[in-house]
């Protein structure tokens, strides 16, 4: 659990050390200021970094708040295995919530589409969990470089009693001073990784030796190409039509979510240094393979206004 210090004087921090210090400061601030915070755990690389930072923030003590995973029932099998192993390894207080109404209706991305699936299983599921446990602050692993609606979001993102985000009703954050005042029923979404980039995340994972889901590394996997996007066949629920051709291809994932809505990329990067080298050369967004971002123009901002993370 040591900080990155190799080759750096005590008087000057590297940019990763500065980002680490800022994130730890934010995490400690939230733990001190709010009555009932929670950390969202989506099992992806950003969540893994955020969890690592939370463990550092309170080491050698335990993390003083629970983790919450909103499970849509359509995550990659390797993600669920990794989630359970991580919770057991670190003795985490992990809450897993599935929207019971969505499960009863049989909501799934193949039949109902990405928009309805995301709204019911993720957005409504998240709001259910936050209301059920009375959380007044929720950490998220979003970064400003990911997507334009996230680029204009504050570190402390104010949400009303219906968990809605109004970009015009946010608070100034001058000199890293954060306003944590909320009325009963209101909440704050907190983003400690706001100032990190995708490359920062990968370099930090490498330097700190952070465990991540194996799906981020290239391997031969069964994929079906639909609308130019390679979808991995993760279980028997994937409908395979006569026109579909399942191919074994060397692919990996830059971002993870529900497997029917997450596209793989062709890659031979099987190690962290190879992924970092690939990131230095790429000219495309990491979210190019997320189908929920392509529902319609401004779809991510609309989802956030409705309560999505």
Curated annotation (Swiss-Prot):
Its EC number is 2.7.7.4. It catalyses: sulfate + ATP + H(+) = adenosine 5'-phosphosulfate + diphosphate. Keywords: ATP-binding, Nucleotide-binding, Nucleotidyltransferase, Transferase. One of its GO terms (molecular function) is sulfate adenylyltransferase (ATP) activity. It comes from the Bacteria. Pathway: Sulfur metabolism; hydrogen sulfide biosynthesis; sulfite from sulfate: step 1/3. One of its GO terms (biological process) is hydrogen sulfide biosynthetic process. With CysN forms the ATP sulfurylase (ATPS) that catalyzes the adenylation of sulfate producing adenosine 5'-phosphosulfate (APS) and diphosphate, the first enzymatic step in sulfur assimilation pathway. APS synthesis involves the formation of a high-energy phosphoric-sulfuric acid anhydride bond driven by GTP hydrolysis by CysN coupled to ATP hydrolysis by CysD. Heterodimer composed of CysD, the smaller subunit, and CysN. This is Sulfate adenylyltransferase subunit 2. It comes from Aeromonas salmonicida (strain A449).
């Amino acid at each position: 659990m040591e900080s990155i210090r190799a080759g750096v004087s005590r008087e000057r921090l590297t940019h990763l050390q500065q980002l680490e210090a800022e994130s730890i400061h934010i995490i400690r601030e939230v733990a001190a200021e709010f009555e009932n915070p929670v950390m969202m755990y989506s099992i992806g690389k950003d969540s893994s970094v955020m969890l690592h930072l939370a463990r550092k923030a309170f080491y050698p003590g335990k993390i003083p708040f629970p983790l919450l995973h909103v499970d849509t029932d359509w995550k990659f099998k390797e993600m669920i295995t990794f989630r359970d192993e991580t919770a057991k390894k670190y003795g985490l207080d992990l809450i897993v919530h599935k929207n019971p109404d969505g499960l009863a209706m049989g909501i799934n991305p193949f039949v109902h589409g990405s928009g309805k699936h995301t709204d019911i299983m993720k957005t409504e599921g998240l709001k259910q969990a936050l209301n059920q446990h009375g959380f007044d602050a929720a950490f998220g692993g979003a970064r400003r470089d990911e997507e334009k609606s996230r680029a204009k979001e504050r570190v402390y993102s104010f949400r009303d009693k219906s968990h809605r985000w109004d970009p015009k009703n946010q608070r100034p954050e001058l000199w890293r001073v954060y306003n944590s005042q909320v009325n009963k029923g209101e909440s704050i979404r907190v983003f400690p990784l706001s100032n990190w980039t995708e490359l920062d995340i990968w370099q930090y994972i490498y330097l700190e030796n952070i465990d991540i889901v194996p799906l981020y590394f290239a391997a031969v996997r069964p994929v079906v190409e639909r609308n130019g996007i390679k979808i991995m066949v993760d279980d028997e629920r994937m409908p395979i039509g006569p026109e579909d051709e399942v191919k074994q291809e060397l692919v990996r994932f830059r971002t993870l979510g529900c497997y029917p809505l997450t596209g793989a990329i062709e890659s031979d990067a099987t190690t962290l240094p190879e992924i970092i080298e690939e990131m230095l050369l790429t000219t495309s967004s990491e979210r190019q393979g997320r189908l929920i971002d392509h529902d319609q123009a401004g779809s991510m901002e609309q989802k956030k206004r409705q309560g999505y993370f």
